[in-house]
């Protein structure tokens, strides 16, 4: 006989809210012991009168398949002395008022392909990983002073087959990984991959939190994809939604005829904006379910981080004109972060929070929520508003560029150009830019350069890397035919060069979260809409000079204050001909001149490209004084 029942400690911890590997108890598990084999099913249904197991193994007839109640708070269990791997199943739940519900398993490891909704008995173990080198490397490096440039994508619409069907997890490994490597992104971020019934929810209205969606293959297939990413040196971040869930009848909503996973009070329970239900984050069993879910994806899928969706929806009670703090959510998020960082200190926990909630990325012991990154939605909104302003009027909204530096170090920020900004009629980033065809591309190159040089880690949604004209069409693939056009190929070349520049020069990432890493040179030139600043690395004199021109005027012999008396070499210029520009670059090193300017002891004279950005580095081979007696003339063009 196989001992299959839960221990008293497991039951206690689950109902206390701290059974953080609850997936080892709940769900369907094939158990082999002493030459015997069987399948155990365990589910939490606190309001149920009866629970029966139905499936393909008993012709969906639950007679004689009653689960036994093993805790007074509603844990039910049954053991079937057969190996049921691969079989479909559901729970047939009799509610307190006598209704009968058919429910998928909240802890199922695999689910039927929509529109079907049954759970599948699946052996989640057994995949042989080959990412040991990646995991060792990750343990040695702190991400805060390393490059982090995320490529965000939706698995189902990045690329499709000729017949319109999806690429599988394994096929995407062959298609996507070389593309990401070619561009130089450090991580990919996948829109939610939990099982969800509606394609157009993009995974944000999930039901099967422990099931990798079967749209693209099996859970082991997804493990293969992530394994291949790691072998190629690419990190994988999952978009994760612990705040609310889909209300379809086979799922978590009113699971046993009454609120179990959701708040009991309708005002708190219903998420009217998205048509979903809010998790009851104060309920211990829900905390066990959700925190375990994060650990599950870390343990079995080796994910490198989570982008936690809609944090504001959790932090404040819903459906109110007044922002009331939800203390349950605060406690949940703090415990979540403490638990996952105890499991993996190098995990990325990224909050998507659109509010000014303080100390999101501060440690919990210091009163913070405990994330290590937060999306900088304020920066994103301000810079896009600025770029959409006609160039001749940008001088009147100068503060849209400068304001972000007043709070840039209040949190550890990621600068996101995400899917949210290129859908629902918002237009693509390229289409947001005003002006002619060429001016749109020039301003997008400028915007990407500014993204690269502004303090904070980076994120770009798929399609942005080649300047997609149309906004994201989630039922279609990206507009790959745009690579037939020079301007889009040149834009793509520019993005690749930006990524090379980003990884090559430490001032662009080493001190992202310290005021020591940024210094304005000229922040006051609103009339010409020109900004100049310094990015610094950890080593003294390891710096870059950045000059941005947000108008269509070109300037020759433009004076910029500099801190070092040496030559400066342009490392990238967005107006270079190979990027689709007009060649207003600085092809030769520029010598610093005596005489203070912009509050700096020396200055240079350079060409400032229209709608352009120029990044310069000091040449370290001796000072100007050692080899030059007269000022170097300014550069006036491109070769």
UniProtKB/Swiss-Prot annotation:
The EC number(s) this enzyme carries: 2.4.1.18
Entry's Gene Ontology molecular function annotations: 1,4-alpha-glucan branching enzyme activity; cation binding; hydrolase activity, hydrolyzing O-glycosyl compounds
Protein's UniProt keywords contain Transferase: yes
Keywords for the protein's UniProt record, in alphabetical order: Carbohydrate metabolism, Glycogen biosynthesis, Glycogen metabolism, Glycosyltransferase, Transferase
Coiled coil region boundaries: none
CDD domains found in the cross-reference section: AmyAc_Glg_BE, E_set_GBE_prok_N
Cysteines joined through disulfide linkages: none
Residues forming the catalytic site: 309 (nucleophile), 352 (proton donor)
Top-rank taxon: Bacteria
Protein's job: Catalyzes the formation of the alpha-1,6-glucosidic linkages in glycogen by scission of a 1,4-alpha-linked oligosaccharide from growing alpha-1,4-glucan chains and the subsequent attachment of the oligosaccharide to the alpha-1,6 position.
Database matches in PANTHER family: 1,4-ALPHA-GLUCAN-BRANCHING ENZYME (PTHR43651:SF3)
Protein name: 1,4-alpha-glucan branching enzyme GlgB
Native organism taxonomy: Bacteria, Bacillati, Bacillota, Bacilli, Bacillales
């Amino acid at each position: 006989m196989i001992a299959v029942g839960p221990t008293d400690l497991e039951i206690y911890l689950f109902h206390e809210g701290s059974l953080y590997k609850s997936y080892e108890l709940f769900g369907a598990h094939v158990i082999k012991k002493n030459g015997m084999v069987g399948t155990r099913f365990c589910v939490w249904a606190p309001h149920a009168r009866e629970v029966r197991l139905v499936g393909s193994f008993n012709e969906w007839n639950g007679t004689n398949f009653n689960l036994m109640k093993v805790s007074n708070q509603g844990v039910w269990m049954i053991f079937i002395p057969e190996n049921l791997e691969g079989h479909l199943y559901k729970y047939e739940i009799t509610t307190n008022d006598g209704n009968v519900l058919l429910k998928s398993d909240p802890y199922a490891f695999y689910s039927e392909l929509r529109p079907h909704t049954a759970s599948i008995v699946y052996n989640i173990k057994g995949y042989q990983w080959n990412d040991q080198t990646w995991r060792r490397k990750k343990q040695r490096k702190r991400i805060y002073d390393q490059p982090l440039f995320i490529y965000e994508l939706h698995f189902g619409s990045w690329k499709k087959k000729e017949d319109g069907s999806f690429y599988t997890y394994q096929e995407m490994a062959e298609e996507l990984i070389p593309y990401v490597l070619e561009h130089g992104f450090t991580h990919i971020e996948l829109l939610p991959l939990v099982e969800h019934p509606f394609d157009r929810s993009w995974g944000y209205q999930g039901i099967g939190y422990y099931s990798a969606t079967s749209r693209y293959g099996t859970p082991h297939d997804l493990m293969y994809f992530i394994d291949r990413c790691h072998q190629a040196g690419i990190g994988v971040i999952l978009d994760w939604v612990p705040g609310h869930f889909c209300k379809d009848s086979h799922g978590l909503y009113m699971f046993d005829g009454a609120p179990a996973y959701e708040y009991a009070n309708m005002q708190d329970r219903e998420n009217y904006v998205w048509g979903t239900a809010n998790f009851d984050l104060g309920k211990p069993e829900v905390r066990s379910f959700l925190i375990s879910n994060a650990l599950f994806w870390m343990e079995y899928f080796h994910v490198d981080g989570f982008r936690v969706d809609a944090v504001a929806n959790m932090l404040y009670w819903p459906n109110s004109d007044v922002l009331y703090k939800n203390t349950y959510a605060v406690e949940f998020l703090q415990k979540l972060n403490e638990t996952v960082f105890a499991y993996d200190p190098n995990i990325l926990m990224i909050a998507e929070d659109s509010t000014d909630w303080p100390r999101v990325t501060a440690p919990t012991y210091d009163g913070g929520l405990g994330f290590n990154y937060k999306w900088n939605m304020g920066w994103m909104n301000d810079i896009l508003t600025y770029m959409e302003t006609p160039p001749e009027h940008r001088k009147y909204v100068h503060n849209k560029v400068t304001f972000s530096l007043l709070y840039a170090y209040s949190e550890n920020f990621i600068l996101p150009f995400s899917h949210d900004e290129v859908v629902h009629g918002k237009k693509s980033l390229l289409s947001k830019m005003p002006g002619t065809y060429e001016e749109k591309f020039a301003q997008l190159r400028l915007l990407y350069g500014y993204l690269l040089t502004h303090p904070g880690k980076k994120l770009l949604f798929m399609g942005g890397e080649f300047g997609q004209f149309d906004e994201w069409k989630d039922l279609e693939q990206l507009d790959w035919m745009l690579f037939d056009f020079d301007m889009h190929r040149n834009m793509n070349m520019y993005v690749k060069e930006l990524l090379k520049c980003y990884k090559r020069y430490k001032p662009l990432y080493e001190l992202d979260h310290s005021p020591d890493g940024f210094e304005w040179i000229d922040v006051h030139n609103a009339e010409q809409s020109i900004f100049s600043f310094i990015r610094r690395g950890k080593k003294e004199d390891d710096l870059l000079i950045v000059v941005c021109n947000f108008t269509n005027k070109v300037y020759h012999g433009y004076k910029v204050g500099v801190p070092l008396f040496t030559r400066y070499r342009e490392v990238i210029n967005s107006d270079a001909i190979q990027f689709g520009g007009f060649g207003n670059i600085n092809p030769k090193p520029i010598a610093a001149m005596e005489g203070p300017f912009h509050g700096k002891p020396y200055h240079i004279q350079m060409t400032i490209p229209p709608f352009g950005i120029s990044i310069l580095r000091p040449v370290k081979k001796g000072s100007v004084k050692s080899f030059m007696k007269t000022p170097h003339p300014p550069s006036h063009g491109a070769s």
